[in-house]
Regions:
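Single conserved hydrophobic/aromatic residue that forms the stacking wall/gate
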Residues: 1-5, 9
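Penicillin-recognizing serine hydrolase domain
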Residues: 18-182
Length: 182
């Protein structure tokens, strides 16, 4: 995401949080109060859904104080993988969404494992997500091999390329596993 696109995304997230906070608490008078109410309710919802180690502070997701665990990430991804529309979207290098007004929005997946022109392209990777904040580079990969699916959560790699190298090491181990071929 470019800096300008990131700023637009952040503003949109705050507009949605402000609106939802107003629905949750019509008496809230300021945008700041409505966003706070939204975030409190979002965190309560996460707890009720069983994501006990996740706390979010910024509706945009650009939050250096947010906390989560690989266990919570795994649970979220497993729930989402139950939906074919989710699998379809995250498995593509680019995805074109048709919006309610009939216009289209093209999303570029930043997962280099899905890009046929990338040195990291791997036809057995079924997608999911990249992410980075500050100097932490993260990657969640769904991998199919030996008739099985593997969910790999790699957090805190040192660079964009090292996150792919880190996961490639795991993929190679899966590919070469005698145990998994039995």
């Amino acid at each position: 995401i470019s800096s300008a696109a990131s700023d637009v995304y952040k503003r949109q997230a705050y507009v949605v949080a402000d609106y939802c906070g107003g629905l949750l608490s019509p008496q809230a008078e300021s945008c700041q109060e409505r966003v706070r109410i939204f975030m409190e309710n979002l965190n309560l919802h996460l707890q009720q859904q069983g994501y006990l180690d996740t706390v979010l502070y910024d509706p945009s997701g650009f939050d250096m104080e947010a906390l989560t665990t690989t266990l919570d990430l795994k649970e979220v991804v497993y729930r989402l993988l139950e939906y074919s529309w989710f699998r379809e979207i995250v498995s593509q290098n680019t995805y074109t969404a048709t919006l309610p007004d009939g216009s289209t929005q093209i999303w570029q997946n930043t997962n280099a494992f899905l890009d046929p022109t990338s040195e990291y392209y791997n036809e057995n990777v079924c997608g999911i997500k990249t992410g980075s904040l500050s100097d932490d580079y993260n990657l969640i990969v769904l991998y199919q091999q030996h008739g099985k699916e593997f969910l790999i959560c790699s957090l805190g790699s040192q660079s964009d390329s090292s996150r792919y190298d880190d996961v490639n090491f795991i993929l190679k181990t899966i590919d070469e596993s005698y145990y998994l071929t039995q």
